[in-house]
Amino acid sequence: MPASRPADFDAVMLAGGRAARMDGADKPALEVGGLPMMIRVAAAVAAAGAGRLIVVGPDRGGAVGPALAAVAAGLPGGLVTVRESPPGAGPVAALRRGLSEVRAPWLALLAADLPFLTGSWLRAVHAIAASSGRPGAVPVDDGGRQQWLASVWRAEPLRSALDVYTGGSLGGLLGPMEPARVAAGQAQEGSTPGLAPRGAPGGRPPELAPPWFDCDDPAELAAARARFEDGDT
């Protein structure tokens, strides 16, 4: 089965906002390496050649909203911002709302706090999913944990699964779909011609930072910032 072209996928970014473990801060807007994390995710989506970026979360004021729009301006389908109903209903509700805006046959499901995500890695996971014969592909970390919010899916099987799923867990929804598992290192950086190698605007993260590294608490945020500082040239 041939790999799909990168333009055949949209991206759904779950960017719900306030985080209890971050003292109520707007986590996606927190900066790592001089840029808000959600801007870094959007830049990776654009570099991967997505058709459109769908952000599920509140409208961002200040500098974040215009910066997000600027990054997505080059996408054929542009930027779409929506909210799950009711707001704060959880990741499955957010995915359901975001999926309703997907027009491509594939989608990337992404968190908004992935400062080390790159376009080349995202395209590599997409290629693995497309060639696997399965409904999607999910990276698996060294501890065997599936990283649902850095995964790629066929839109129609995901819609069908959502139609009958009544729970609130992403793992409960996505696990039974039996996606291809992408081991650490399997989706190699730079394996897709024509895309920039590892590195991101505002800093060059060191090689050991995995693309699915997220920042769920202050310690992880501090670790991400330190990695960017260590990698700056």
Regions found by a protein language model. Name each.
Residues 2-168, 172-211, 218-222, 229:
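Nucleotide and nucleotide-moiety/phosphate-recognizing core
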Residues 232-233:
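Cytosolic-facing loops and C-terminal tails of multi-pass membrane proteins
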